[in-house]
From Swiss-Prot:
Induction: Up-regulated by the transcription factor ERF114. A zinc finger (PHD-type) spans 402-451. Residues 135-147 have a biased composition (Low complexity). GO terms for cellular component: nucleus. Residues 482-577, 598-713 form the BRCT domain. The gene is BARD1. PANTHER family: BRCA1-ASSOCIATED RING DOMAIN PROTEIN 1, BREAST CANCER TYPE 1 SUSCEPTIBILITY PROTEIN BRCA1. It comes from the Eukaryota. GO terms for molecular function: DNA binding; ubiquitin-protein transferase activity; zinc ion binding. SUPFAM superfamilies: BRCT domain, RING/U-box. A zinc finger (C2HC pre-PHD-type) spans 331-382. Binds specifically to H3K4me3 regions of target genes (e.g. WUS and WOX5) promoters to repress their transcription via chromatin remodeling. Required for the shoot apical meristem (SAM) organization and maintenance, by confining WUS expression to the organizing center, and for the quiescent center (QC) development in the root apical meristem (RAM), by repressing WOX5 expression in the root proximal meristem. Plays a role in DNA repair and in cell-cycle control. This is BRCA1-associated RING domain protein 1.
Amino acid sequence: MAEFTNMLMNPWVLHLQKLELELKCPLCLKLLNRPVLLPCDHVFCDSCVHKSSQVESGCPVCKSKHPKKARRDLRFMESVISIYKSLNAAVSVHLPQLQIPNDCNYKNDALNNSNSPKHGESEDSEMTDKDVSKRSGGTDSSSRDGSPLPTSEESDPRPKHQDWTEKQLSDHLLLYEFESEYDAANHTPESYTEQAAKNVRDITASEQPSNAARKRICGDSFIQESSPNPKTQDPTLLRLMESLRSDDPTDYVKAQNHQQLPKSHTEQDSKRKRDITASDAMENHLKVPKRENNLMQKSADIDCNGKCSANSDDQLSEKISKALEQTSSNITICGFCQSARVSEATGEMLHYSRGRPVDGDDIFRSNVIHVHSACIEWAPQVYYEGDTVKNLKAELARGMKIKCTKCSLKGAALGCFVKSCRRSYHVPCAREISRCRWDYEDFLLLCPAHSSVKFPNEKSGHRVSRAEPLPKINPAELCSLEQTPAFTKELVLCGSALSKSDKKLMESLAVRFNATISRYWNPSVTHVIASTDEKGACTRTLKVLMGILNGKWIINAAWMKASLKASQPVDEEPFEIQIDTQGCQDGPKTARLRAETNKPKLFEGLKFYFFGDFYKGYKEDLQNLVKVAGGTILNTEDELGAESSNNVNDQRSSSIVVYNIDPPHGCALGEEVTIIWQRANDAEALASQTGSRLVGHTWVLESIAGYKLHPVIG
């Protein structure tokens, strides 16, 4: 059982010795005390690097220069050292015979002439050796005054033959040889112990001691009670065993160099070995925590003495959590214009995977392409086959090679129609340039320098729609068209959620009555043509709400059919939409009549503050609606507080706090209720503090859709 335990613990002893070497300071050769990381990635004790900096500034190993403020404390290394001490103590309890004593039975006079501990010994090793000596019965290999004990075979009290112990310790030495051969085969950096084991192989291959002598050497290396006859042992192997007993495994290498080289060569070679081994040990030690060190360098607050402030860990965790929150946010960036902003000029954000539109949680997959509807609509080489987008990836790759003339960012796939012109734009950037000209039929653009150039459809008159041939016009209808009132030429049509057939019908109507089609809302629109369901209700879109606020006609697609049938625009009132899908009634008619009589706007005199989280772009649309309705936007809580202080004597406050009542995307049912409830509580606290009224964002939409103020809380 004891033999099995020893065989099981041998790897632990080997790796603990390796770990101890990695945790030692290259200067004092003791376990790191308050470890400090230099910019060159070398680690030393705080006191050692302080003493070294008084002699020469810079790293003692690589000699690189650095200011004192660039040093970083490695607090986690102290925890690693503490764990190592606990592991070493646990192994010492269960396997005391494998502990390497501090002093050797046979000291070479040329190597050690003093009784004091060596320079590289650590306090932990001394304490461990004392404990082992006590457990071994209080006998030590040397006397109290430091002189060696008698070494003759007659004075050796132990039995001469301990087969199981010698076999076990011989296996332990073979384990050293196996580890060294494995590291050499895989080209890994060798530690101090592995280098010593490698030297053992070279010596034993040349001198070839007997098996009995090898067993005595191994037994004497790890058992304190053993005291073999020095006459039967090779002195070179004895020096190796002495180095293994000490805390500095390079003693054997140094002794061998002293024996073979002159003094000057010995000093240079030992210094080189020390520098190389120390740098390799520090490099291996810092491979894993290098990323953590970089985070600490970026986030921790450094005082004038180069010490980390007490709250650096808290600040680091806060910054990491903020970065994670920002990374996991639901913002998607357009592949063309490199912007996440959603506005009327950009259109909604669309998401495509392999040419097919996706929604929900699928939009955050790695293979999904995000583009604005306007950007993909005006991309020259992108086209549709049904609902599938073709050539999108190739167009994105082409656009990423072209810089925008306005913002100098890549992704400008839309170029000027003039072939010799090298100007290219993002679609949102081009819309901000008033002198750009647009062809909404062929999706062509003219830059300000070539705005006088004619589009193809302007050279040969209005082009017939490719989607559907125009109905034949007989001479009688042609005469009626000539007699059409002049105001029909000023028709500006804007479709809202129309089907493909309704879009073709609107194009035919525009050609027939010389009307203009606007794909986006603008104040010049005269008719908003919206699709309706079987009940005659329309979808509540931004175009419909803007049309209501501006007093425009909000009509259904039947008006276009009736106008084409009558060969002239018919009266719009019978086709005016009365209700939307949310149940709000008579909003378009009420708004239109009030606009005709120049009555105050819907939100005249009201001031709105939008509180909390909103989807990017959606909040801007809400604020634009409020402005068009006559309301005022308060951008900060300070402005809200100042407004409430001005209206202290007013019984009815004019300031309104608006919060988002839509649940976040992708949340479970229980989480949605909790989040919305928390938003309402926070908004209510702000409203009560400033004396404002509190509403959800749907209150704004419903008031506009019905063109009347709904009841307000508070």
